[in-house]
């Protein structure tokens, strides 16, 4: 193997991560807190590639919940923030704001903090149900927890459905 051999495929970093989800409530009313921490290990590929393919790291924190407003109405929501560094070798940011994350995440000049979320209001009046949905993902929202995700959009949706046969 020669790192200069262009016929060799681009390598991939060994990526590790951990996370948890903890919640409280019932199936009708609940709230969950979740966290994901993932990072690439720079030493897992040949040094030749380090400035061509940067190692990344990410932390995601989110809240997800459901509230049964009344018998036919339910509200569900999911909101998450992602702090994503595209280069773990970039210089660390030294400021009062970033000190709050010391020991949790190294904020670098290659780091971005973005938000994503959705809210759904559903009404179930048998045999008809309806839903109003709003989704938002900020530009450049990224997470190492998903292989692909569209970003930079807002969407509003309305849907209705019914049963034809029992």
Map each language-model feature to its residues:
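Signature for the C-terminal beta-barrel architecture of outer-membrane proteins
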Residues: 1-166
């Amino acid at each position: 193997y020669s790192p200069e051999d262009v016929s060799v495929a681009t390598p991939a970093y060994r990526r590790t991560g951990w996370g948890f989800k903890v919640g409280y409530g019932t199936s009708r009313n609940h709230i969950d807190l979740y966290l994901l921490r993932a990072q690439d290990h720079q030493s897992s590929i040949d040094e030749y590639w380090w400035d061509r393919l940067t190692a990344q790291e990410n932390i995601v924190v989110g809240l997800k919940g459901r509230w049964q407003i009344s018998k036919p109405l339910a509200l569900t929501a999911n909101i998450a923030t992602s702090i994503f560094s595209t280069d773990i070798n970039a210089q660390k940011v030294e400021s009062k704001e970033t000190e709050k994350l010391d020991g949790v995440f190294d904020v670098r000049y290659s780091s971005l903090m973005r938000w994503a979320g959705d809210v759904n209001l559903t009404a179930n009046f048998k045999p008809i149900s309806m839903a109003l949905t709003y989704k938002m993902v900020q530009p450049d929202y990224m997470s190492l927890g998903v292989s692909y995700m569209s970003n930079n959009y807002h969407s509003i949706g309305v849907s209705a459905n019914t049963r034809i046969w029992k």
